[in-house]
Amino acid sequence: MNRLFRLLPLASLVLTACSLHTPQGPGKSPDSPQWRQHQQAVRSLNQFQTRGAFAYLSDEQKVYARFFWQQTGQDRYRLLLTNPLGSTELSLTAQPGSVQLIDNKGQTYTAADAEEMIGRLTGMPIPLNSLRQWIIGLPGDATDYSLDDRYRLRELNYTQNGKTWHVTYGGYTSDTQPALPSNVELNNGAQRIKLKMDNWIVK
């Protein structure tokens, strides 16, 4: 299959929206009770959704899109990528043991692993299995991470399939309890992924 994306070049607009602002102030210890309490509060969120701006940047391709992420239960989530005109470029629906992806031509694909499938079909090696944790400010399987001055995740390093992802958090929203990320950037040296969340809805 050819590249799924034929997005319009609103690069400057989206990149500006996705620019990161590193939190200031001294970091806190990952062993602190405040961090454990924050993690417990985030893990208790069974259902949530967010939307915003997405950018994928590499030497091979540059993709700019709007995204919608919805989790409806453990291992049940939906990801939509739309172009600047609002047309759906990719729709991915995951549930335990099964993933379905529909491309911009209406073609449907199924697989057992979302991460493998989206990388194979789009050419974008997005670490979806880890991103599900990182997008809500949890380190997932990463053990090398640091906190900001409010006991929230500030950055982490995680090696997967020979690639080390460096993840930085540019801010958190105060509109939700617990606070959730408003900017996240993933960088492995060859690829960068930027997410700017416009809003969160939690249950």
UniProtKB/Swiss-Prot annotation:
Q: Where is the lipid attached (N-palmitoyl cysteine)?
A: C18
Quote the residue positions with lipidation, kind S-diacylglycerol cysteine: C18
GO biological process terms held by the UniProt record: lipoprotein localization to outer membrane; protein transport
Q: Which residues form the signal peptide?
A: 1-17
Keyword Transport applies: yes
List localization entries: Cell outer membrane
As for membrane topology, the entry says:
Lipid-anchor
The annotated subunit structure for this chain is: Monomer.
Q: What is this protein called?
A: Outer-membrane lipoprotein LolB
Source organism per UniProt: Klebsiella pneumoniae subsp. pneumoniae (strain ATCC 700721 / MGH 78578)
Gene symbol of the encoding locus: lolB
